[in-house]
Amino acid sequence: MKKIFDTTFTIKEVVATGIGAALFVVIGMVSIPTPVPNTSIQLQYAVQALFGVVFGPIVGFLTGFIGHALKDSIQYGNPWWTWVLASGLFGLVVGLLKNYLRVAQGVFESRDIITFNVAQFVANALVWVVIAPLGDILIYNEPSNKVFAQGVVATVANGLTVAVAGTLLLIAYARTQTKSGSLKKD
């Protein structure tokens, strides 16, 4: 049986977390606005998905949590903690795919692409339509119609962004990995 969470945290994973969070911040500074206030199309979730799938759920969580907290602090002066948590949880859920996808073995084919995209759309819906809006209502006393509208737009925008850019990143990453049995003795 495969472990869902490995309790060890390697130097490689610490470095990956730092790089992932830094990329989350830098890429997150470029966003495409939507008609819904405080909601935009953001490419950093594709990178977070890559880091989650390659390095696992803890790196996926920390990449989003730290990256979003820093990005909000730089852009707005302070983090919006419910959405910071949602970003982290997105990375955690997608990171659970590490043991089920075959990117580390150099394989990311139709079955893997479908599994990845179903999981990331479910993760996006969970964090942006359920967790972030409920947190906004309970913690920040935000109007429910506003936060659920933001959540739906974020789910669609992030889901499509990760479906396209995240899939392309994972295909590219898988191609850099050596497939088992691909080396032959001359």
From Swiss-Prot:
GO CC entries: plasma membrane
Keywords: Cell membrane, Membrane, Transmembrane, Transmembrane helix
Compartment(s): Cell membrane
Annotated TM spans: 14-34, 50-70, 77-97, 119-139, 152-172
Residue ranges that the Swiss-Prot or TrEMBL entry lists as coiled coil: none
Transmembrane helix is among the record's keywords: yes
Superkingdom field: Bacteria
Pfam family of the protein (one): ECF-ribofla_trS
Membrane topology: Multi-pass membrane protein
UniProt family annotation: Belongs to the UPF0397 family.
Protein name listed in UniProt: UPF0397 protein SGO_0469
Source organism per UniProt: Streptococcus gordonii (strain Challis / ATCC 35105 / BCRC 15272 / CH1 / DL1 / V288)
